[in-house]
């Protein structure tokens, strides 16, 4: 008990006996930490959460360093093995040099893959690239585009493009119909002339 507030004893109360402030009545803070509210309320909140996730590209320098480190680990393992067999230092250096050149030219023989964040990011990047090609996803595809709220300008531009495509389709159909009609008339004219010539030839005979 403190200041005549609280329990005389904590026994049987299921609490520690200390007085704590009730925060149930406090208003939930809006916006990010710091008390700054979102720009225009709910719309700005939706805009912020609808942005596509940011994928950090792996650092090629770190990946190269990790590859070289793994090569040297293999070389040191070979060196220890040859030293235990009692080989000459020159022969050991030659074998280590051959193995180093082989692993540098064919890094896939290192086996396994790194467990650091950059190695995992590189493997994930390759996996996503394969999946993208398999599903036929465009390179310019924007993640989260389906959940992005369309502005009035974007909607007007989209409708204008749709009307333009529809107009071009109708014009192309009319042009094809006119060409077909023209070819039909030309064929009928040729057929009429052919029949006339044939009729004249029969009259002469």
Curated annotation (Swiss-Prot):
Listed PANTHER family: SERINE/ARGININE REPETITIVE MATRIX 2, SERINE_ARGININE REPETITIVE MATRIX 2
Name the UniProt record assigns to this protein: Pre-mRNA-splicing factor CWC21
Subcellular localization, as worded in the UniProt entry: Cytoplasm; Nucleus
Coiled coil: 63-103, 148-190
Pfam families: cwf21 (PF08312)
Similarity section: Belongs to the CWC21 family.
Keywords for the protein's UniProt record, in alphabetical order: Coiled coil, Cytoplasm, mRNA processing, mRNA splicing, Nucleus, Spliceosome
Annotated function: Involved in pre-mRNA splicing. May function at or prior to the first catalytic step of splicing at the catalytic center of the spliceosome. May do so by stabilizing the catalytic center or the position of the RNA substrate.
Originating species: Cryptococcus neoformans var. neoformans serotype D (strain JEC21 / ATCC MYA-565) (Filobasidiella neoformans)
Domain CWF21: 63-106
Gene: CWC21
């Amino acid at each position: 008990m403190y200041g005549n507030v609280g329990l005389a004893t904590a026994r049987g109360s299921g609490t520690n006996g200390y007085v704590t402030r009730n925060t149930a009545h406090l208003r939930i803070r809006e916006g990010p930490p710091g008390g700054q509210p979102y720009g225009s309320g709910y719309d700005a909140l939706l805009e912020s959460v609808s942005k596509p996730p940011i994928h950090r590209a792996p650092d090629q320098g770190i990946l190269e360093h990790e590859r070289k480190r793994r090569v040297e680990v293999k070389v040191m393992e070979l060196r220890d093995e040859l030293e235990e067999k009692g080989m000459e230092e020159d022969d050991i250096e030659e074998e280590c040099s051959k193995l180093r050149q082989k692993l540098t030219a064919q890094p896939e023989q290192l086996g396994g893959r790194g467990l650091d964040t950059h190695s995992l990011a590189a493997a994930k990047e390759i996996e996503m690239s394969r999946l993208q090609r398999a599903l036929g996803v465009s390179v310019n595809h924007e993640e989260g585009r389906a959940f992005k709220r369309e502005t009035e300008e974007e909607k007007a531009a989209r409708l204008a493009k749709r009307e333009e495509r529809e107009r071009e389709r109708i014009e192309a159909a009319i042009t094809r119909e006119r060409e077909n009609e023209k070819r039909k008339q030309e064929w009928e004219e040729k057929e009429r002339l052919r029949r006339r010539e044939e009729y004249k030839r029969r009259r002469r005979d």
